[in-house]
């Protein structure tokens, strides 16, 4: 908890000392129009989220089939949010709404500030000067309307069912900004640094001032940050808005790096106008660019160094109930896995918490609009063949307004490395020209026309690809495929299908009566796609085809874990092995909006999947990996400094007897994979890889269950969703092993416990799953285990840290 508290404190920034203030209005009441029943709520919030918190739907609305059966008619009528506040005398007052879902009638003390027909649009930021209406005691009322079927609303697409209320509510902070005469409305910092010489940097500032009074005002704009201070005399005419451009030089700047490349150094800048309003922003000094490789793939370059982007896709909670604490835990899990990027397809977040944390922790972010606006069955607007649904007015103007407002909102975040103006398609030429006019005025980062492999007549090729798969593929696919989603280029979204949660979470989301035999809730908690990825059948076939007949619920879950671990790990490892030809990989998804069986590295309850730990092993800074295509052992290193290492290779046969032992010293350099050996062909078994540094300390491990022959994919019939499998890799020898005897011991440690597993038997013990169980029987969420899903050779001992207290620790073995 101390880590979370420290991170949240970082978000507070530097407080402004002058009397003017910016108060966030968080305490509201909410009621359905025509009803006298009122609910106390904390804004930002959706109507459905507030009702969920109030117990309106019951505790289990998201479990089983209950969400499918829920009554949505209560959202047909408007809902009214009301708050009261005091406004200080002698000040000008501005109300700022950062997101409304989807439109609203806004009144202050009975005075209409805006009507629903002028406030449609979830990503518009709106300010209202309310000085003439605000007094000592004020009543603010916001009457929100649900998004119509045809709209540019939040993009939930097919990862989960649509929210019951279509994300209806006050979705961003509402702020009361009180200032004497002049408001410092916006401050933007563009850092300019030569990546070949970090001795100094230019700080190009754009400062927007608004004179809220009806008379001219003269004063001094003051700015302060580490290493710089300045004063600028300014005269503003009555009601004038002025944009100032000012540049300062910082000597010997602290440079912002992603976590794997260095330290994410941050600065704070405070800008004030006399004794009037002040504004603080946080920024980082770094250089970000992108280029197309000789093969036409998008390559991002941070501070002069090419980056292999290793990311996953973010979504908000279906009720938008994320808190600073839950977001902090999730970003910590991203860091724990070794991922260096989060892709936001949709401008997620009720506020900037997730982006602030990415800045602090050195996690890159890719921002862009949702493919929901590119398919008529999601957007509700007519679909054009090439460009989706944003066609003509008022939709193009609304999209440009979205782009403008969100660029301004997010452009000070150093973690943000680029904008994707579309996802599955690209904007039409008229719309993209309007986007670029705004972008070139406000931004400097790489602009990319699409997350898909398209070429714009205006901005050129995207350099990206989006060719799947989204269903299960064998781990060898990532090495063997050279046409679709394999390890080449920049794959903006892909995933080997079901990432099944641990059994405790599965039972929570399905209900015991649905678990076995499999009931319809299994398919309902896959994805909401109408075409594929909506059934558990592919995973059942893969589990049986790979490991053998299913013995029941727990046996299926464990075999599905093993499939997830191997293929998700191999996806990242293959891109590392092919670094240079491979420039980026984004797992679809990082998390889930609701209790799901698909597309996640940790589940809705915050508990890691098997794939989580597969990714954690895949992304050790320097690691030994198995190339499924060539059977080679490869040392990979994306960004770590040059160093000497010692590699140990142990290969045991399918009968758990030693076959091969190899030792090798080598030097690892960034972006230079090293082949260290090769396994014999057509020989199944267990592979243990251990990497030690010059001092003999273990710095990385990897363990594989190797088939004699990889899964055989039907390359001729590959499709956008995936590829048929002609025959599965046979790992049935794992299931035929006698059950191993594993002794578990615990010892207290700071903040948790040390857990030691010892395999006392003469056979391999495959994927032991450690559990930290709370008093209510649920698993502790978050990055609790240093490692998990642990396999042990005969006689092997492993000790791992459990970062949880007051829990029951247990271990699930293979063959439950």
Where are these regions (language model features)?
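Extended carbohydrate-recognition surfaces in non-catalytic/accessory domains of CAZymes
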Residues: 19-96, 118, 152-170, 180, ...
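An acidic-aromatic loop/edge-strand motif
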Residues: 28, 54, 63, 67-69, ...
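Accessory beta-strand-rich segments of carbohydrate-active enzymes
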Residues: 28-34, 76-183, 212-213, 228, ...
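Active-site-adjacent substrate/metal-binding segments within catalytic domains
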Residues: 60-84, 91-97, 102-107, 114-117, ...
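Short strand-edge motifs at loop-to-beta-strand transitions and within beta-strands
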Residues: 81-83, 124-128, 240-248, 672-675, ...
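Extended acidic/polar, glycine-enriched regions
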Residues: 132-137, 206-292
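Carbohydrate-binding surfaces of carbohydrate-active enzymes
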Residues: 207, 212-214, 519-787, 792-802, ...
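Substrate-binding/catalytic cleft of secreted carbohydrate-active enzymes
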Residues: 341-533, 563, 567, 572-574, ...
